[in-house]
């Protein structure tokens, strides 16, 4: 089959924003104007197409990244048809994992900002994630019809708070109730959308006289930004004082692709103004898969190699999301980087070293699906029938093996115990939690060996609430939930602590003998770069002359690794520790793998106790936005929670307080902040780092365990 849309007309984009910036409404308008939906869904009615989970419709927030394909030929239908693969990502801080994995497979992004709230805490988190993957992006300042809307202030905040270089492509005509349309700085014309046609009909008019001066200055700034792309453009601009429309677009596009500038559009998705012109901007300014650098990976020998975005290259794709569908079972969302895949083909999972057959390939439209026969470089689709694939796995041609760069997921910071309400729920709960953990790499499940309880861990209270909710709705499992628990860690402060342990048992029959001498130290910054570091633990074998035979070295390491999952201090995982195996002895007959494993485990426990062990607690970066009247109360409360104030800022929604607060002090904070400020303040928090817990806190935690 021949490719339906040339690859240079593809745009794989994410719609990203802070919660409540109007991101899902913006996505709904895109679907409407692109002709996918003949009726608009609204978030506040719980009818948004992109928010397809029941919890999303109830809570009015987006939790999972819904993927949708639409086609766009320009606002005036004058451009060749372009294919947009759009991913709508969640804005709540507990779901940053969804944003992270979407960004990994996107080529560009539209950053939706609220014209009233401006750059919010979550905006900064999402921005950092986009920087990490070097994603070219543009901004859409939404909600220009809202009271307090201020386009210029938001542009200023993009510069001040995110360190971006914003280049406005439009100037709004009016604001709040008086928002009428936008001035297109390329054409120097005013665009007015017709309300009766829900914005499908528009007309160009002359710029209102009172805005001519402002528009001219903004255009000069835009043209200058374009001219800086190349020496030729700069020479032409300096000599002639102007550039042609096509030259301006080429210059701006080049700089956007290098992530040097952020083109800024504006409008009101709810009032059907501006989204249409922003879509034209996606075509003009954001990259196609062919514009992005070839994706890097490793071949089977571990050498670096690259995948070019071309159908003629061998097949390679990245699985970026697993989802359980009530009708077809497990769905694997994947992005094709190179080559072609037909339904029924065999693919090789180069991470799991397994071959699998792709049953059906589905083109997803939120949670609707169309079956397709093939996918090509640049496509984003879902496969049915892949059993062993997990998020971050590479799928490739078995004759051309490649492992694409893996995604790194954050460690959970909060845990709680769950138990089934009835005997019949017991079996179903295990299956439900297994499925949910397969879908979401930032969610973990384990069984506490001592109590037999099932412990679930995640990125925040809301994250775990929704997991429990999904268990009830999707899997019909009723569960009782314990109080949230903090994910503490254990480490040591003393270096070069020697520990010598001999495991000997000789009471008739075959005996047991294992003897190890280890040195325990905290990991230095240099140690952290060591190639053998696995999971914040470093094992170094310094045995020479065969004092311990080679076959026992691996069991020794295994014994150590098993011990650090539950530290000697209070049963929390041990982090940041280096163990050197320096000496030992063995017995020709009585030595065994088990004996050395036990000796290593006991040597570690004894050494750890002598190495000044400490408890580490997770510290959260908290940002509180509140009217000024409540500042004193909020700051006092932050101090009572052992928080350290990092500074204050002004935002369009009030004062912004930045603080570092231990997670253990943050449970129930939403309720407390609400009552302190009559519901007028909001906050967002994300994990920042681990820090040594004060002695009184550590003692209390250790006593409880």
Swiss-Prot record:
PROSITE patterns: G_TR_1, G_TR_2
Positions bound to GTP: 17-24, 88-92, 142-145
Keywords (A to Z) from UniProt: Cytoplasm, Elongation factor, GTP-binding, Nucleotide-binding, Protein biosynthesis
SMART domains per the UniProt record, alphabetical: EFG_C, EFG_IV
All residue ranges annotated as the tr-type G domain in the record: 8-290
GO-annotated cellular components: cytoplasm
InterPro entries (UniProt xref): EFG_II, EFG_III, EFG_III/V, EFG_IV, EFG_V, EFG_V-like, EFTu-like_2, G_TR_CS
Pfam name, any one: GTP_EFTU_D2
GO BP: ribosome disassembly
Subcellular location: Cytoplasm
Keyword Calcium attributed: no
GO molecular function, one term: guanosine tetraphosphate binding
Function per UniProt: Catalyzes the GTP-dependent ribosomal translocation step during translation elongation. During this step, the ribosome changes from the pre-translocational (PRE) to the post-translocational (POST) state as the newly formed A-site-bound peptidyl-tRNA and P-site-bound deacylated tRNA move to the P and E sites, respectively. Catalyzes the coordinated movement of the two tRNA molecules, the mRNA and conformational changes in the ribosome.
Similarity comment: Belongs to the TRAFAC class translation factor GTPase superfamily. Classic translation factor GTPase family. EF-G/EF-2 subfamily.
Listed name of the protein: Elongation factor G
Organism expressing this protein natively: Xylella fastidiosa (strain M12)
Gene expressing this chain: fusA
């Amino acid at each position: 089959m021949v490719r339906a849309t040339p690859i240079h007309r593809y745009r794989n984009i994410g719609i990203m924003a802070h919660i409540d910036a109007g991101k899902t409404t913006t996505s709904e308008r895109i679907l409407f104007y692109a002709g996918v939906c003949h009726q608009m869904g609204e978030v506040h009615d719980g009818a948004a197409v992109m928010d397809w989970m029941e919890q999303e419709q109830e809570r009015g927030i987006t939790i999972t990244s819904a993927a949708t394909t639409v086609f766009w030929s320009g606002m005036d239908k004058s451009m060749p048809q372009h294919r947009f693969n759009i991913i709508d990502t969640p804005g709540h801080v507990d779901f940053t994992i969804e944003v992270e994995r979407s960004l990994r497979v996107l080529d560009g992004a539209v950053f939706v900002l609220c014209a009233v709230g401006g750059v919010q805490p979550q905006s900064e988190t999402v921005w950092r994630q986009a920087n990490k993957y070097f994603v070219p992006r543009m901004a859409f300042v939404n909600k220009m019809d809202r009271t307090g809307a201020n386009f210029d202030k938001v542009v200023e905040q993009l510069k001040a708070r995110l360190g971006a270089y914003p280049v406005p492509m439009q100037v709004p005509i009016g604001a709040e109730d008086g928002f009428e349309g936008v001035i297109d700085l390329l054409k120097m014309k005013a665009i007015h959308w017709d309300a009766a046609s829900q914005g499908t009909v528009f007309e160009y008019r002359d710029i209102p006289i009172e805005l001519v001066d402002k528009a001219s200055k903004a255009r000069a700034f835009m043209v200058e930004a374009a001219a800086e792309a190349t020496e030729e453009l700069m020479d032409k601009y300096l000599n002639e004082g102007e550039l042609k429309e096509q030259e301006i677009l080429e210059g701006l596009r080049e700089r956007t692709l290098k992530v040097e500038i952020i083109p800024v559009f504006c409008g009101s998705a709810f009032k059907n103004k501006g989204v249409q012109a922003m879509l034209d901007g996606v075509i003009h300014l954001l990259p196609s898969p062919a514009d992005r650098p070839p994706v890097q990976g490793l071949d089977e020998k571990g050498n670096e190699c690259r995948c070019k975005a071309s159908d003629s290259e061998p097949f390679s794709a990245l699985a970026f999301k697993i989802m359980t569908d009530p009708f077809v079972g497990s769905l694997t969302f994947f992005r094709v980087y190179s080559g072609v895949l037909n339904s029924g083909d065999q693919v090789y999972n180069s991470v799991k070293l397994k071959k699998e057959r792709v049953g059906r390939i589905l083109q997803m439209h939120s949670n609707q699906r169309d079956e397709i026969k093939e996918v090509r470089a640049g496509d984003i689709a879902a496969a049915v029938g892949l059993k062993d694939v997990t998020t971050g796995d590479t799928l490739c041609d078995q004759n051309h093996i490649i492992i694409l760069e893996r995604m790194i997921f954050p460690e959970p910071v909060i845990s709680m115990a769950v138990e089934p309400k009835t005997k019949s729920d017991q079996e179903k709960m295990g299956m439900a939690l297994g499925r949910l953990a397969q879908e979401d790499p930032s969610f973990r499940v384990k069984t506490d060996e001592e109590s037999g309880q099932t412990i679930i861990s995640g990125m925040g209270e809301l994250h775990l609430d929704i997991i429990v909710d999904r268990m009830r709705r999707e899997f019909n499992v009723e569960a009782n939930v314990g109080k949230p628990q903090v994910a503490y860690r254990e480490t040591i402060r003393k270096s070069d602590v020697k520990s010598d342990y001999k495991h000997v048992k000789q009471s008739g029959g075959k005996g047991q003998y294992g003897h190890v001498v280890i040195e325990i130290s905290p990991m230095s910054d240099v140690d952290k770069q060591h190639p053998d570091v696995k999971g914040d633990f470093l094992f170094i074998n310094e045995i020479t002359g065969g004092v311990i035979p080679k076959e026992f070295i691996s069991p020794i390491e295994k014994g150590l690794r098993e011990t650090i999952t539950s530290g000697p201090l209070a049963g929390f995982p041990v982090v940041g520790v280096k163990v050197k195996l320096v000496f030992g002895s063995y017995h020709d007959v009585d030595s065994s793998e088990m004996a050395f494993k036990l000796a290593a485990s006991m040597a570690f426990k004894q050494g750890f106790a002598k190495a000044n062990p400490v408890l580490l607690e997770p510290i959260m970066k908290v940002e509180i936005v509140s009217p000024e009247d409540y500042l004193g109360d909020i700051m006092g409360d932050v101090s009572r929670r052992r928080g350290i104030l990092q500074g204050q800022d002004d935002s369009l929604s009030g004062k912004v307080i930045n603080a570092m607060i231990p997670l253990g002090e943050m449970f129930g904070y939403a309720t407390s902040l609400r009552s302190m400020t009559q519901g007028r303040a909001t906050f967002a928090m994300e994990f920042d780092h681990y820090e040594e817990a004060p002695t009184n806190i550590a003692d209390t935690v250790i006593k409880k365990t």
